[in-house]
Regions:
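N-terminal targeting signals for export/organelle localization
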Residues: 1-27, 129
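A short beta-strand-turn-helix
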Residues: 24-41
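Short pre-active-site segment immediately N-terminal to redox-active cysteine/selenocysteine motifs
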Residues: 39-42, 46-50, 93
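Thiol-based oxidoreductase modules, predominantly thioredoxin-like and allied folds used
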Residues: 46, 65, 70-83
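Typically the conserved alpha-helix immediately C-terminal to a functionally engaged Cys/Sec
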Residues: 55-67
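Structural micro-motif
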Residues: 90-98
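Non-catalytic, surface beta->alpha helical segment in thiol-disulfide oxidoreductase systems
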Residues: 101-129
Length: 129
């Protein structure tokens, strides 16, 4: 199965920035090795397409993609379809959002629905305007 990759998440499909200026890229699941994106603040949202909180976050993530394109990578990983990623990122509940600095170091972790204001505030605290 192929996944859509982009700078931010929309809905609950995998989206990732591989490099500034790239909007859409097709990739296989092994490309999760590029997450977190080196050299860029990265937000990973781990959840499942069929979960209500993911569906609620979809329009927020669409907006985040537009606002932060080229400034931050916002990645969604469906852990029901990619169970190994749940272990890799040590999650015990979904949704979980993890923020990484440009060096790939985890800076902040949140469990549960995360609204737009909270996402914007966290990105801003990490220097992303």
């Amino acid at each position: 199965m192929k996944y859509r990759l982009i700078l931010a998440t929309t809905g609950c499909v995998l989206f990732i920035t591989v490099m500034a200026g790239v909007s859409w890229v097709e990739a296989e699941p092994q490309d999760f090795s590029k997450v977190p994106v080196k050299g860029m603040v990265t937000m990973i949202d781990l959840g499942a397409k069929k979960r209500i909180p993911c569906k609620m976050m979809a329009p927020i993530m669409e907006k985040m993609e537009k606002v932060y394109r080229g400034k931050a990578a916002i990645v969604f990983i469906d852990v029901w379809e990619n169970r190994e990623q749940a272990g890799r990122f040590r999650i015990s509940s979904i949704p979980t959002q993890i923020f990484f600095d440009p060096e790939g170091k985890e800076v902040y972790r949140h469990v549960g629905f995360m609204g737009e204001e909270a996402i914007v505030a966290q990105l801003k605290s990490m220097g992303v305007e």
